[in-house]
A protein has these predicted regions:
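Hydrophobic alpha-helical segments typical of transmembrane helices
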Residues: 44, 81-84, 97, 106, ...
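Membrane-anchoring hydrophobic helices of lipid-metabolizing enzymes
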Residues: 1-70
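Non-catalytic C-terminal accessory region of glycerolipid acyltransferases
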Residues: 2, 128-241
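Short, basic, glycine/proline-bearing loop/turn elements
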Residues: 45, 116-120, 151-152
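Short gly/ser/thr-rich secondary-structure transition/capping motifs
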Residues: 51-59, 126-128, 183-185
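Catalytic core of membrane glycerolipid acyltransferases/transacylases, capturing the structured
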Residues: 19-25, 37, 51-52, 66-124
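Generic preference for hydrophobic
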Residues: 58, 72, 95-96, 116, ...
Length: 241
């Protein structure tokens, strides 16, 4: 992680103060529009990808619902996951992330500017509050990204257990579920290298509420995981990294 992150920072040495100052300004300022905040986040994401020698290949973006108020559920490979999707996606979204990220320089301000929420995975009561908050915001038209594994997989493109509780936000909001398959996004920060890498983000067809209505969240988790695994198996050898 160190080499590529250092390269990103060195190549953005003149831009970093501007970005950080604006993140501090935007993070908790409700008077600044969501679109303006997200424009800053995308600029940071775009510069990070370009200066970090990371090619992000996006597929299926047309599958994102035209109407806001949905939740995206990707597999989780590391810190680059969100940056990669920000780089691809022109539509603002928020993210639920583990509370440990709150202490990471700039990451806290980025998540706050996105309207994201920090979750304590060890506190079920707080977790339920976050799930309810996500559901309420999605009902109001905000889009969210939730990692159903809860933590990143440490086995490359192999998936960990999908926590059924993460899908309670969707069942409460009665919103479309958008599965996403992330491939090789662990490479930018998990390998001690600055060579060019190609990562893939596949947006799968959404699952409308009518399709999963009445299902248990464990069943929904299994369906989403199965669809993501299928796409990864079909595409993980598309590039030579």
């Amino acid at each position: 992680m160190a080499k590529r992150l250092i390269m990103m920072m060195l190549r953005n040495i003149l831009y970093l103060p501007y970005a950080f100052i604006n993140l501090l300004r935007y993070a908790k300022n409700d008077k600044i529009s969501e679109e303006k905040k997200y424009k800053l986040i995308r600029l940071i994401g775009n510069r990070g990808c370009k200066c970090g020698n990371v090619n992000v290949h996006g597929y299926g973006l047309e599958n994102l619902p035209k109407e806001s108020g949905y939740i995206m559920y990707p597999n989780h490979q590391g810190l680059f996951d969100v940056m990669g999707f920000v780089h691809l996606n022109p539509t603002p979204f928020s993210v639920v992330i583990k509370k440990e990220a709150y202490n990471v320089f700039m990451l806290r301000q980025i998540i706050q500017t996105m309207g994201g929420l920090f979750m304590d995975r060890e506190d079920p009561r707080e977790g339920l509050k976050v799930i309810n908050e996500v559901a309420n915001q999605v009902k109001s038209g905000r889009n969210f990204l939730i990692f159903p594994e809860g933590t990143r997989s440490k086995n490359g493109n192999r998936l960990g257990e999908f926590k059924s509780g993460s899908f309670k936000a969707a069942t409460k909001a009665k919103c479309p579920i958008v599965p996403m398959a992330i491939i090789d996004c662990y490479l930018p920060f998990d390998t001690n290298s600055i060579r060019k890498v190609d990562v893939q983000i596949h947006v799968l067809p959404p699952i409308p509420y009518e399709e999963y209505q009445g299902m248990k969240t464990a069943e929904i988790a299994d369906i989403v995981k199965e669809r993501i695994e299928k796409v990864i198996a079909e595409n993980e050898h598309n590039f030579e990294n």
